[in-house]
Amino acid sequence: MKIRCLHDWNVSLEEAADIQRTLKGMLSFEFPAKKVSIVAGVDVSFPQKNLGLCVIVVMDDTLKVIESVYHTQEVHIPYVSGFLSFREGPIFIETVKKLKIVPDLFFFDGQGIAHPRGLGIAAHMGLLLEKPSLGVAKSHLFGSYNEPGRNKGDFSYMYNKTGEIIGTVLRTKKNTKPVFVSPGHMMDVDTAMSLTLKYTGKYRLPEPTRQAHILTQRLRKNHLLR
């Protein structure tokens, strides 16, 4: 899979913010007409202080897992809100290189454009891959919204400070906390929401990222990271 090199990773926070603002202008919000049949879910965690683990699970349109890969490496960039992709991006890229199947779409456990500078990890990584991407976050980072209804499929839009729609607050399971869905690259707001619902079963989170998280927990439990 082709991965574009658009910037350095070893940069200051000020430089990272400038990179985010620049890359934001390169995003496309047009979803390609090609049918989505193979999707990937991404989960990044830190089982040890300076050890990162990235898991990618690839599924077909029946939600069957057809490939899974993982990669570990040392990560010495600390977590700073709004700069997650600079901490997790390099390990994600190394994990993507292990894939034999090329997904049509990537789901990320994180933000797309619902981000202070419009470039969360889903948008950032989608741009590097030139692949459709979206973020489904468990918690709110940026944007104003009203609480959606309590039933599955209820939603409200998220807005940035200028009133532009940047995502949705989506109820994926009745009477549970909503998720925060925003487009990454080659994606629009409404398609991101409909795809999230399509790939969400009886649980709160979409199956691609849920299965990636399950594999992460299995790897850690089985001590495969030692």
UniProtKB/Swiss-Prot annotation:
Residues reported to bind Mg(2+): 43, 109
Cofactors demanded by this protein: Mg(2+)
Annotated catalysed reactions: Endonucleolytic cleavage at apurinic or apyrimidinic sites to products with a 5'-phosphate
Cell location: Cytoplasm
An example Gene Ontology molecular-function term: magnesium ion binding
EC number assigned by the record: 3.1.21.7
Record-linked NCBIfam families: endonuc_V_Ttgales
Protein name per the record: Endonuclease V
Gene designation: nfi
